[in-house]
């Protein structure tokens, strides 16, 4: 749907978002087995980077496997990874943090030395939480109003499902901001941290990585900041009219992941 200004030979690795690129909820987007067979024939390295921190890395590896995609844990990161990267820089000795989030975020923090507690919390960390309660929001609000740092996983206000767009992490953050007047420090995309981690693990330069995502203001913006090539797919939260307005324009705009791969292999 857009002029392709990159070639198959210039790309060494694909960095893929998941929600809206690989699947919507529990439904695969297209024939993922065929897509990844084509990726394998092209000999591209593959990495997965999602802003969704609800699952652990182990759970994401297992989920990918159910769709016929085989990945190792080093190939997968989420915004919880970026949160712990930031926390280690700010609080190298670890400590208590109050978490509004799900298992993926809580476990990642614990593994990094930050345990979930409101007592003496050095930070409030919030992300997507499908079990959010008034009590959780109240505690987070009181801590932030008392001067505790507010950190958000990612600003995505919606999340693509087969039923349509539903509230995402950004909606939780917005509620806390409304009650405190404090904007969170965002750790995940569009901050480039997740992509920097991916490039380090892949051992490649930014210009040799193609980032494929469905949300321009996070997936594409973060990649563009550090010089990665970008492909915006219309299988998630963005339609063609919205895609056409995004500046700077992605290198590729396509209907879905399969279309991106087909454009590249036909070059």
Predicted regions and their residues:
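Asp-based, Mg2+/Mn2+-dependent phosphohydrolase catalytic module
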Residues: 2-18, 23-44, 53-77, 84-267
């Amino acid at each position: 749907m857009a002029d392709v200004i990159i070639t198959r030979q210039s790309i060494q690795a694909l960095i893929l978002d998941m929600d809206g690129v690989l699947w919507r909820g529990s439904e695969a987007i297209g024939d993922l087995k065929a897509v990844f067979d084509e990726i394998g024939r092209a000999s591209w390295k593959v990495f997965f980077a999602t802003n969704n921190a609800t699952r652990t890395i182990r759970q994401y590896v297992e989920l990918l496997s159910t769709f016929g995609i085989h990945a190792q844990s080093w190939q997968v990161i989420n915004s919880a990874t970026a949160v712990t990267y930031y926390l280690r820089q700010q609080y190298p000795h670890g400590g208590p943090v109050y978490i509004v989030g799900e298992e993926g975020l809580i476990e990642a923090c614990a593994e990094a030395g930050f345990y979930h507690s409101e007592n003496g919390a050095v930070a409030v960390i919030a992300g997507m939480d499908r079990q959010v309660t008034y009590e959780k929001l109240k505690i987070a609000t009181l801590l932030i109003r008392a001067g505790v740092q507010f950190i958000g996983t990612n600003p995505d206000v919606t999340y693509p499902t087969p039923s349509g767009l539903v509230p995402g992490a950004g909606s939780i953050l917005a509620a806390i901001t409304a009650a405190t007047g404090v904007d969170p420090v965002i750790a995940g995309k569009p901050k480039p941290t997740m992509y920097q981690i991916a490039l380090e693990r892949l051992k490649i330069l930014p210009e040799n990585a193609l980032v494929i995502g469905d949300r321009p203001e996070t997936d594409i913006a973060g990649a563009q900041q550090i010089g990665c090539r970008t492909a915006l797919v219309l299988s998630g939260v963005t339609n063609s009219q919205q895609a056409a307005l995004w500046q700077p324009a992605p290198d590729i705009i396509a209907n879905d992941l399969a279309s991106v791969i087909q454009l590249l292999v036909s070059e």
